[in-house]
Amino acid sequence: MKIIDIEAWDRKTPYKNFVRYTNPIFSLAARLDVEAVYRRSKRTGRSFFADFLFLVTASLNRVESLRLRINEKGEVVLYEQIAPSFIVMQENGVIATCRTEFTLNYEAFYQTVRRDLEKKARMESVQEEFNRKEEPDVFYTTCLPWLDFVSMSNPYHYEDASASSIPRLSWGKFVKESDGHRRLTFDIAAHHALLDGKAICDAFAVMSAALEEADAFYEDPKSVLDAICHKLGIQDKL
């Protein structure tokens, strides 16, 4: 983790402007072609959710601005790696949050997600989970597989700058379109003091490219993402 010197930061002016806003959150939504991942998940008997979550988390970790957070002291910090914290629907219909540590080892991540999902789904009480203050080195993630929506809004506690600095990732039901490919809407909401629309566009570009190379990606995610980011000119600067 690295603390950013605001006074020496290129984003000093927009940061100081947007951090004062009552609502500093903005979001962008776009369609993603998930056909290759869907086919692979079907072919291998794997969970589409876990497979897609791995690709999303790996891709977004490559966009430096999406790893920036505001900590409890009001400092801007850059994390080396971000983990997904996603919503689980329990057997009784009540939602719970589930953080899974991230690794670029696909098999290890997949097995951890499946284990965490099953464990959380069986928990009788989640009150403690919702009350616990966690480190902001996560992406808050939610999936609504029942609806092919156009955009998404998320709840925020705007007085808590640290929690509000955590990006929200949302996606809906995938549908087969006229060309035979399955697509879904993916929404990214982020704190405008930390990043602009270009960073989210970069995130969509990396995800889209990884989705096109799904088979190669799951075999060697680092090499595929290295090549994608080199081609797109996406690199860490801080």
Where do the model's predicted regions map?
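Flexible, Gly/Pro-enriched loop and linker segments at secondary-structure and domain junctions
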Residues: 1-29, 49, 127, 135-177, ...
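Domain-scale detector for complete catalytic domains at protein termini or as standalone homologs
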Residues: 1-19, 23, 36-38, 57, ...
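Gly/Ser/Thr-rich phosphate-binding loops and adjoining beta-strand/alpha-helix segments
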Residues: 19-51, 67-84, 138-141, 163, ...
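Acyl-group handling in specialized metabolite and lipid biosynthesis
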Residues: 26-28, 37-44, 93-107, 195
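Acyl activation and transfer enzymes in specialized metabolism, enriched
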Residues: 37-64, 184-205
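Small-residue-rich loop/turn and linker elements
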Residues: 66-99, 127-137, 221-233
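Helical lid/core segments from catalytic subdomains that handle acyl or acyl-like groups
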Residues: 90-149
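Active-site-proximal acidic secondary-structure segment that organizes catalysis
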Residues: 107, 119, 163-219
